[in-house]
Amino acid sequence: MLARRNRVTSGADYRIIVRRGRRTTTGTAVVSALAGPDDAPTRFGFIISKKVGNAVTRNLVRRRLKAVSAGLLHSVPPGTSIVIRVLPGMERTAWDTLQEEMASAVTRAVRTI
């Protein structure tokens, strides 16, 4: 579970990260990363549209992404903000594949900052 300080919570922050951040894509997500001040915590945010599925499916995907992100917190530099926009099809992705894809995408996005 991600602590509140490790989550992107405001709509304005989402907008800034998606517009100004560096993008990396996988088959099931678009990852945007934006560097911030080194004294700020690493933050993750998720955008899951209704095209992914009904509310139960979207919440399942969100919970899985939160679990993956919690494991990636210490591998991302402090102050980095990451937004993961889910594409349709992620709900069918196996857990192991999801972990590998997200770790790879986040690493690539952070490297380009």
UniProtKB/Swiss-Prot annotation:
Disulfide bond annotation, renumbered to this chain: none
GO CC aspect terms: ribonuclease P complex
A Pfam family: Ribonuclease_P
InterPro entries in the cross-refs: Ribosomal_Su5_D2-typ_SF, Ribsml_uS5_D2-typ_fold_subgr, RNase_P, RNase_P_CS
Enzyme's top EC category: hydrolase
Function comment: RNaseP catalyzes the removal of the 5'-leader sequence from pre-tRNA to produce the mature 5'-terminus. It can also cleave other RNA substrates such as 4.5S RNA. The protein component plays an auxiliary but essential role in vivo by binding to the 5'-leader sequence and broadening the substrate specificity of the ribozyme.
Protein name per Swiss-Prot or TrEMBL: Ribonuclease P protein component
UniProt gene name: rnpA
